[in-house]
Regions:
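Accessory C-terminal segments flanking Radical SAM cores
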Residues: 271-362
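Radical SAM/AdoMet-radical enzyme domain recognition
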Residues: 98-118, 124-237
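Radical SAM enzyme [4Fe-4S]-AdoMet core and its adjacent flexible, acidic
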Residues: 1-10, 169, 178-291, 300-305, ...
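Conserved alpha-helical substructure of the radical SAM core
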Residues: 2-156, 161
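A short, flexible beta-alpha/helix-coil linker loop
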Residues: 83-89, 173-175, 241-244
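A short linear boundary/processing microfeature
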Residues: 81-84, 164, 183, 328
Length: 362
C-alpha cells in the first residue's frame, strides 16, 4: 500500500468513525453538535495532509503523546513502567514543559493531524498540559486515564471542552480490574462513569485484553454494564508482554482471531457503541501503522518513537520540530525495511521484531 493509498484509506476510516460517533451520540444534542463541528475541521485537516503528501511528506492522522512519566497507580505488567516511560530510573530525564507541548499541539494542527491521544503515566497529573490541549479546538484529544483523579475541577474541564474525550482504563469486571490496578479502583471508575453520564459527556473505556480476561471483556454481561454506565466507545488493546515473565498473558494467533470475531459480533449487537481494536484493526490497513504511517509516539521527555511498545528513537522534540521528527531517518528505515508495512497477522509487529528495530539505529 502506497502512502497516498494509505492516506485515502485513513481518511475513509476517520469518516466512518465520525459517522459512527454521530450514531452513538444521537440522543445527546451537545455531543452531536460538537461532532458535526469537528467533521468540518477534520475535512480541512485531510486537505492539509494531502498537500504535504503532494510535496513528498506523509503526515499521520494520529499522534500518541505520553505527557508525563508519573502515575498514581502501580498496575501489574504496565508497559509504561517497563519501557521507562513511567516513574523508573530508565526515564529519559525532565518531562517536556507545557510550552513545548503547546508548540507540538499547534504544529500538529497546522500539519493536519486530527487526533492526539494523551497518555502517560497518568495524564491527569499534568493539569497544565490538559488545559493547553483544551485550548486547541481544532484537534480531538482522547485522554487515556486510570480515572481515579477524574473528579471536581477535572469534570468541569471535560464538560467545558468537548475536544477532550475521557477514556477510562478497565481490565474487565471488578475482580479483573482490582487484581491488576489495585483494590477499590473498579468502584471508583464506575462512579466516575456515572458522573460523566450525568453530565452527558461522550466517553470511552480502554481494555487491555489478555488470555485471562478475553472472554470476560467481550461478554454480554460486561458490555451491558458499560451500556448502563453511558459508555459509547470501547477500545480493545491486545496485551504486549514487555515483562518477559508475563508472556503467558499475550494472545495467541487463535486468540486474536477469536477476539476479532467477538468484536464483529459486538458491533452488530451494540450499534450505538463504537468498537476499536489495537493493533487488530491494523491488518486492514496494509500493516503496522507505527513510525509515522498512521501515528507515532512522543515520550514524556520528547523522544519521537515509532510506537509506545517500541521505545527507540533518533530524534527528540527538544532539538527538532514536529515536522523534522516525522521526517526521521529512523522512521523512514522502518517503513522501507518492510518492518511496519508488511503483512500483518496480529499482535504488535515492532515489539515482536525488537532486535531488527534496534539494528536500524546502529
Amino acid at each position: 500500500m502506497t502512502t497516498r493509498e494509505l492516506n485515502i484509506y485513513m481518511n475513509q476510516s476517520i469518516e466512518r468513525l465520525i459517522k459512527n460517533t454521530l450514531k452513538a451520540t444521537f440522543a445527546n444534542p451537545q455531543a452531536t453538535a460538537f461532532v458535526l463541528k469537528m467533521q468540518k475541521v477534520i475535512v480541512e485537516a485531510q486537505k492539509k495532509r494531502e498537500n504535504y503528501e503532494t510535496s513528498g511528506t506523509h503526515i499521520p492522522a494520529f499522534l500518541i503523546s505520553s505527557i508525563t512519566d508519573n502515575c498514581n497507580l502501580f498496575c501489574s505488567g504496565c508497559y509504561a513502567r517497563s519501557n521507562g516511560i513511567c516513574g523508573t530510573s530508565k526515564s529519559t530525564g525532565e518531562n517536556l514543559s507545557v510550552m513545548q507541548w503547546k508548540q507540538i499541539f499547534t504544529d500538529a494542527v497546522e500539519m493536519g493531524i486530527s487526533f492526539n491521544l494523551l497518555a502517560g503515566g497518568e495524564p491527569l497529573l499534568r493539569k497544565d498540559v490538559i488545559f493547553a490541549a483544551a485550548d486547541v479546538k481544532n484537534m480531538i484529544f482522547p485522554v487515556f486515564t486510570n480515572g481515579t483523579l477524574l473528579q471536581g475541577e477535572y469534570l468541569d474541564i471535560f464538560v467545558n471542552n468537548r475536544n477532550l474525550i475521557p477514556v477510562l482504563s478497565l481490565e474487565g469486571e471488578q475482580n479483573e480490574t482490582d487484581k491488576r490496578r489495585g483494590n477499590g479502583v473498579y468502584d471508583k471508575i464506575m462512579l466516575v462513569m456515572k458522573q460523566l453520564n450525568a453530565k452527558k459527556l461522550f466517553f470511552g473505556t480502554s481494555v487491555t485484553v489478555t488470555t485471562e480476561n478475553r472472554q470476560t471483556v467481550t461478554s454480554t454481561s460486561f458490555l451491558e454494564t458499560l451500556q448502563k454506565s453511558g459508555c459509547k466507545l470501547v477500545i480493545y488493546v491486545e496485551y504486549v508482554p514487555i515483562e518477559k515473565d508475563t508472556a503467558y498473558l499475550a494472545l495467541t494467533n487463535k486468540d486474536c482471531e477469536e477476539l476479532d470475531q467477538a468484536i464483529d459480533i459486538l458491533r452488530k449487537q451494540y450499534e450505538s457503541t463504537i468498537f476499536l481494536s489495537f493493533p487488530g484493526d491494523e491488518k486492514y490497513m496494509g500493516g503496522c501503522l507505527a513510525a509515522g504511517r498512521g501515528f507515532f509516539h512522543i515520550s514524556p521527555g520528547g523522544n519521537a518513537e515509532a510506537c509506545p511498545f517500541s521505545p527507540y528513537s533518533d530524534r527528540n522534540l527538544t532539538q527538532v520540530s514536529l515536522l523534522e521528527a516525522i521526517q526521521s531517518p529512523f522512521f523512514e528505515k522502518l517503513r522501507s525495511s518492510g518492518l511496519v508495512d508488511g503483512e500483518h497477522t496480529g499482535g504488535c509487529t515492532l515489539f515482536e521484531k525488537e532486535d531488527d528495530v534496534k539494528n536500524l539505529l546502529l
